[in-house]
């Protein structure tokens, strides 16, 4: 508010001292610009002094001539005009034409062209020197760059780490078929694992020892990790005399009576092996037991799919005891 009051007082003083009074438009303009800042108020006061100096002739001058008079009076005669020879003496870099300034290094005969004295351009040196002939020269190099390069000697692990996410398939192909086989076996094992995790798990691949361990609460390995019977045991069983087989055929009822306590195995056996059920009254000879063991091994080597729900409890049998003896 103080600056506004000072501007109004200055404008009143200028109006009273002038030969002609300011109109309402000029007064508002003078008041507004005088209230912006102290420097603006000083400029407006200097302009009023110039107008007072010229008197009534100031109103008859064209606006362009008024601006020229104001600029000349405000700057002062001491300011040098552009192109003044005194300026060239103070700034020797402005003497020579741009882009042709040569720099000499002391007393030695070393000269170079000043790169900063060149005319300004938005383009770089490579863009200014670009031509069609440079393209024709670079064509053979581009064609050689497009040719397949020999594989690098870096290890495969580092190549797989350096490969970007977009080029993952190319890095996998470079690792070779061994890696693909590894990945295939990995997914196969996962599929076998997930097969035995659901509520409708299949128990046809479980051995009696695995069933017993499940009843005890121990962790059972899946079928893909189970060790197959040794070839020596197979050969020994194959070399057994044929009279055992004949005894097995002669007494089918005894074998069915031994198999009766296993409900899951009774369902899995073919209908030809099922015989009339009866109470176990006679003791079983060891030869017949060995024959039954051979049948059990044959059943587990070639499993038949059995639909067993998870709610059923598989009972412990004598075969389980003999298997873990």
From Swiss-Prot:
Species assigned in the record: Bos taurus (Bovine)
Phosphoserine: modified positions: 37, 126, 171, 285
Bias (Basic and acidic residues) ranges: 229-248
Residue numbers bearing the N-acetylalanine modification: 2
Top-level taxon of origin: Eukaryota
Ranges of Polar residues composition bias in the record: 133-144
Region Disordered, annotated ranges: 1-21, 76-100, 133-177, 190-285
Keywords: Acetylation, Cytoplasm, Phosphoprotein
Compartments where found: Cytoplasm
Gene Ontology terms: cellular component: cytoplasm
Principal subcellular localization: cytoplasm
InterPro entries in the cross-refs: DUF4706
Protein name stated in the entry: Uncharacterized protein C1orf198 homolog
Compositionally biased region (Low complexity): 1-18, 261-281
Pfam families xref list: DUF4706
């Amino acid at each position: 508010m103080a600056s506004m009051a000072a501007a109004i007082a200055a404008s009143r003083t200028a109006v009273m001292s002038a030969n002609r009074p300011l109109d309402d438009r000029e007064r508002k303009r003078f008041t507004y610009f005088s209230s912006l800042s102290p420097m603006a108020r000083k400029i407006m006061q200097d302009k009023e002094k110039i107008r007072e100096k010229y008197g009534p002739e100031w109103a008859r001058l064209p606006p362009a001539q008024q601006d020229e008079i104001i600029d000349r009076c405000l700057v002062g005669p001491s300011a040098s005009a552009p192109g003044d020879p005194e300026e060239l003496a103070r700034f020797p870099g402005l003497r020579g034409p741009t882009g042709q300034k040569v720099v000499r290094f002391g007393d030695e005969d070393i000269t170079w062209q000043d790169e900063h004295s060149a005319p300004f351009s938005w383009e770089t040196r490579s863009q200014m020197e670009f031509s069609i002939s440079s393209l024709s020269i670079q064509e053979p190099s581009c064609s050689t760059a497009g040719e397949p390069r020999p594989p690098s000697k870096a290890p495969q692990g580092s190549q797989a780490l350096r490969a970007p996410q977009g080029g993952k398939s190319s890095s996998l192909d470079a690792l070779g078929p061994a890696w693909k086989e590894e990945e295939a076996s990995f997914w196969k094992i996962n599929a076998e694992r997930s097969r035995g995790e659901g509520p409708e798990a299949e128990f046809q691949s479980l051995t009696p020892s695995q069933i017993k361990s499940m009843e005890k609460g121990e962790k059972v390995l899946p079928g893909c990790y189970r060790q197959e019977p040794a070839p020596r045991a197979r050969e020994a069983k194959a070399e057994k005399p044929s009279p055992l087989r004949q005894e097995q055929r002669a007494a089918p009822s005894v074998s069915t009576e031994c198999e009766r306590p296993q409900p899951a195995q009774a369902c899995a056996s073919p209908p030809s092996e099922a015989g009339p059920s009866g109470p176990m009254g006679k003791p079983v000879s060891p030869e017949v037991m060995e024959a039954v063991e051979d049948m059990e091994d044959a059943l587990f080597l070639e499993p038949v799919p059995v639909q067993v729900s998870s709610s059923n409890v598989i009972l412990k049998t004598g075969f389980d005891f003999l298997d873990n003896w």
